[in-house]
């Protein structure tokens, strides 16, 4: 039993190579079935995302090159192209790597939580194909609990490191409850969609989407039960908004100082947060001069993000310590399992010797042998048989000039305790 992790990721391989080595839904089941039938593999889990492809295996001794060859052949990629970008981890290093990946410590965005869901899905897919053996089952279950511990004991995922999430976090800091806030989203592109998802996840249910094309706005609005308006209608709805988040490709500002000033009067000067994440700006810079209007630009958000990245790096130190501790503990547990097999075999061997000699002694007694003589002969033979293997091990260690091995054997036999 030996744990192996091989793979490529955004650190080691180009996008082109990552695409070639990816296991899409159409390939995954076949790949897992092939690995299950591989003579060198006891169990396997394949993790394949846009940033990494990794194969985790419980393998027989010396199977490293065989699994690499299989990966090369499966994707029909030459080893000369694959190997320079490939990393290989074995035993505790493989355990540690899986735990680091699952905790977001090896991600493009440090501490991102999505990778844990992807690891869980990879494990689930492998279980469906009956590719997960007992060792991998224990490893992945332990990994999930370690990831939970890291999230509980550190704040590695608690600081915004994307513009969309930073905008939402800023809104949460300024307004006590997003559940009571009305948000005007200007634009309907990918960034605004991410903002809407973050807002919705944080309890915001009152959203207005303003966009140049109504069709795109409707697609977004349907996901969150939001109202749709045109860009021209913004002046008529701006006063309703506690929060305005804007990201369009407009070459000119969409929201001007006068428009906001009018809206603030209608709001009786209740504060309004405006987050402009467009380049060039969607909101005139002069809006920031107005009382009760709090304007933040993409540069302000980047400053928050940079600070949060540094905070995540600090939290990552504690997370790495947890992973180091847990991976070492799991490796110790695995080694103890290997010892269990050896102990079982040793006990069985001793029992076989005992039964053999006892049978001979009983036959001697039945034949009228002297009981004392039979018992002495039994004890002598039993002693000689049981000490033969350790005696030979002591002799070999001495003959081969290996004092360290000799010391270990002496300690194992408890000889030093007899002095």
UniProtKB/Swiss-Prot annotation:
Protein name per Swiss-Prot or TrEMBL: Glutamyl-tRNA reductase
Site label Important for activity, positions: 97
Miscellaneous comment: During catalysis, the active site Cys acts as a nucleophile attacking the alpha-carbonyl group of tRNA-bound glutamate with the formation of a thioester intermediate between enzyme and glutamate, and the concomitant release of tRNA(Glu). The thioester intermediate is finally reduced by direct hydride transfer from NADPH, to form the product GSA.
InterPro entries to which the protein is assigned, alphabetical: 4pyrrol_synth_GluRdtase, 4pyrrol_synth_GluRdtase_dimer, 4pyrrol_synth_GluRdtase_N, GluRdtase_CS, GluRdtase_dimer_dom_sf, GluRdtase_N_sf, NAD(P)-bd_dom_sf, Shikm_DH/Glu-tRNA_Rdtase
Residue numbers annotated as active site: 50 (nucleophile)
Keywords assigned: NADP, Oxidoreductase, Porphyrin biosynthesis
Binding site for NADP(+): 187-192
Catalytic activity entry: (S)-4-amino-5-oxopentanoate + tRNA(Glu) + NADP(+) = L-glutamyl-tRNA(Glu) + NADPH + H(+)
Gene name, Swiss-Prot/TrEMBL: hemA
The protein's enzyme class: oxidoreductase
MF terms in GO: glutamyl-tRNA reductase activity; NADP binding
Leader sequence segment: none
Keyword set includes Transcription regulation: no
Pathway note: Porphyrin-containing compound metabolism; protoporphyrin-IX biosynthesis; 5-aminolevulinate from L-glutamyl-tRNA(Glu): step 1/2
Subunit architecture: Homodimer.
Entry comment, domain topic: Possesses an unusual extended V-shaped dimeric structure with each monomer consisting of three distinct domains arranged along a curved 'spinal' alpha-helix. The N-terminal catalytic domain specifically recognizes the glutamate moiety of the substrate. The second domain is the NADPH-binding domain, and the third C-terminal domain is responsible for dimerization.
Domain of life where this protein originates: Bacteria
Binding site for substrate: 49-52, 107, 112-114, 118
One GO term of the biological process aspect: protoporphyrinogen IX biosynthetic process from glutamate
Native source species: Vibrio vulnificus (strain YJ016)
EC number, as in UniProt: 1.2.1.70
Protein function: Catalyzes the NADPH-dependent reduction of glutamyl-tRNA(Glu) to glutamate 1-semialdehyde (GSA).
Pfam family, one: Shikimate_DH
Family: Belongs to the glutamyl-tRNA reductase family.
């Amino acid at each position: 039993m030996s744990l192996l992790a091989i793979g490529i990721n955004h650190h080691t391989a180009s996008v082109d190579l990552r695409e070639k080595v990816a296991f899409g839904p159409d390939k995954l089941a076949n790949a897992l079935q092939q690995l299950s039938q591989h003579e060198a593999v006891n169990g396997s889990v394949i993790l394949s995302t846009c940033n990494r492809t990794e194969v985790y295996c419980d393998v027989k001794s010396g199977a490293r090159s065989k699994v690499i060859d299989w990966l090369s052949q499966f994707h029909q990629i030459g080893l000369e192209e694959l190997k320079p970008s490939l990393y290989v981890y074995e035993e505790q290093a493989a355990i540690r790597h899986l735990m680091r990946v699952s905790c977001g410590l090896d991600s493009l965005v440090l501490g991102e939580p999505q990778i844990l869901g992807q690891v869980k899905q990879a494990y689930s897919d492998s279980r469906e194909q009956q590719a997960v053996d007992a060792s991998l089952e224990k490893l992945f279950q332990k990994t999930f609990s370690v990831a939970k511990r890291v999230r509980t004991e550190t704040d590695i995922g608690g600081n915004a490191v994307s513009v969309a999430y930073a905008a939402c976090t800023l809104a949460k800091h300024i307004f006590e409850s997003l559940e009571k806030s009305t948000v005007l989203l200007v634009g309907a592109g990918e960034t605004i969609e991410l903002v809407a998802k973050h807002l919705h996840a944080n309890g915001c249910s009152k959203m207005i989407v303003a966009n140049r094309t109504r069709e795109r706005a409707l697609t977004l609005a349907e996901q969150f039960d939001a109202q749709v308006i045109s860009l021209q209608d913004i002046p008529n709805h701006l006063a309703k908004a506690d929060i305005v988040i804007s990201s369009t490709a407009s070459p000119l500002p969409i929201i001007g100082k006068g428009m906001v000033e009018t809206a603030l009067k209608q709001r009786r000067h209740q504060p309004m947060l405006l987050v402009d994440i467009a380049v060039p700006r969607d909101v005139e810079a002069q809006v920031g001069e107005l009382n009760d209007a709090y304007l933040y630009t993409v540069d302000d958000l980047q400053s928050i993000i940079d600070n949060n990245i540094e905070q995540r790096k600090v939290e990552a130190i504690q997370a790495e310590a947890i992973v180091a501790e847990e991976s070492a503990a799991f490796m110790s547990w695995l080694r103890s399992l290997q010892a269990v097999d050896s102990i079982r075999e040793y006990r069985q061997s001793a029992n076989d010797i005992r039964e053999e000699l006892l049978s001979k002694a009983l036959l001697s007694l039945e034949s009228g042998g002297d009981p004392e003589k039979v018992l002495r002969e039994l004890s002598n033979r039993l002693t000689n048989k049981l000490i033969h293997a350790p005696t030979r091990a002591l002799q070999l260690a001495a003959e081969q000039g290996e004092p360290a091995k000799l010391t270990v054997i002496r300690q194992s036999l408890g000889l030093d305790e007899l002095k």
